[in-house]
From Swiss-Prot:
This is Large ribosomal subunit protein uL15. One of its GO terms (cellular component) is cytosolic large ribosomal subunit. Keywords: Ribonucleoprotein, Ribosomal protein, RNA-binding, rRNA-binding. The lineage of its organism: Bacteria, Pseudomonadati, Pseudomonadota, Gammaproteobacteria, Chromatiales. Part of the 50S ribosomal subunit. Residues 1-54 are annotated as: Disordered. One of its GO terms (molecular function) is structural constituent of ribosome. Belongs to the universal ribosomal protein uL15 family. InterPro entries: Ribosomal_uL15 (IPR030878), Ribosomal_uL15/eL18 (IPR021131), Ribosomal_uL15/eL18_sf (IPR036227), Ribosomal_uL15_bac-type (IPR005749), Ribosomal_uL15_CS (IPR001196). GO terms for biological process: translation. PROSITE patterns: RIBOSOMAL_L15. Binds to the 23S rRNA. The gene is rplO. Pfam families: Ribosomal_L27A.
Amino acid sequence: MRLNQLSPSAGSRPDAKRAGRGAGSGLGKTAGRGHKGQHSRSGGFHKVGFEGGQMPLQRRVPKYGFSSQKGLRTAEVRLHEIARVDGDTVDLAALHKAGVVRKNMRYVKVIASGTIDRAVSVRGVKVTQGARKAIEAAGGQVVEEG
């Protein structure tokens, strides 16, 4: 038996209301659509947000703000991922080369997740306080660049 073979037990669910099946059904004649008007007709439809020709709310309210693209180009790197970088210097180019971050990433921040067991020099990359302590405890250094 599979999930798509399950069905509710008989009588546990009410039957669906079938529109336009006689007056006794409660949805006969106009089938719950009322008399005349756009919504009673087949194809009676208007797009979402349409207000009958009145200037819609979405266009009446002014635009404001913007979406910063910096978040799309910022990567977080864990301490144990730094170990994948060859050499003693960890910078943006070295992280790209090692495949730790994608080529389109322009900003990197090292976060204190995992452990680091070798001395590395981190330069040109932002580092959290916890990550800085871990790097320095392993004998490495963090070089701030202007």
